[in-house]
Amino acid sequence: GKQISGPEGLFYATKEGLEAKGAKIHMETEVEKIDFENKKVYATGKNGEKYEESYDKLILSTGSLPIDLNIPGKELENVQFVKLYQNAEEVIKKLENKDIKDIVVVGAGYIGVELAEAFQRIGKNVELIDLADSCLSGYYDKEFRDLMNKNLADNGINLNYGEKVLEIKGNGKVEEVVTDKKSYKADMVILAVGFVPNTKLGKENLELFKN
């Protein structure tokens, strides 16, 4: 909602700032293999350049990945995840298109609620959908959630709880979101149904908790 000047405002550190402190940074680089026995990390950059780094101590902070909804139509244009810096940049750029008026946000957790509020502030028609019976379900008690729901509704956000998204429809671009109760016009859809730990890297050598 223009509370920050751009997507860079979402981050507390920059590449330049970290380099100024002596860190070696490889952006847009995928770690493909970790040799735990010999303490080496192998990676490939976006341009195909190969990297090999040795370590004394290794910190795995691979974060999380968006939960992938297995529904038809998720590949349509303007169906967005918002997880990475690049995702935020893409959404902000697309919102410059005046034809994007109706936005459906799927998922009423922290990210879904914040995005719904931000879209409403810039004049978009917002539908917030969640399978639960309230926003922020599992985070707060009913009293606080009721206040939050009232605040969202009072600010013009349409709340659609207890609904399961079945399909996203469109011809190349998204046009409609279909749930088990009704359908919603959509020029953009934000999928914000949560995250799972990104444990793929090195999991064959590490003991993981079941949760």
Label for each model-derived stretch:
Residues 4-5, 10-11, 102-103, 110-167:
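Rossmann-like dinucleotide-binding cores of NAD(P)H-dependent redox enzymes
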Residues 11-102, 176-185, 190-192, 197:
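FAD-binding core/adjacent interface of flavoenzyme oxidoreductases
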Residues 21, 74-75, 122, 155, ...:
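Short, structured coil segments at secondary-structure junctions
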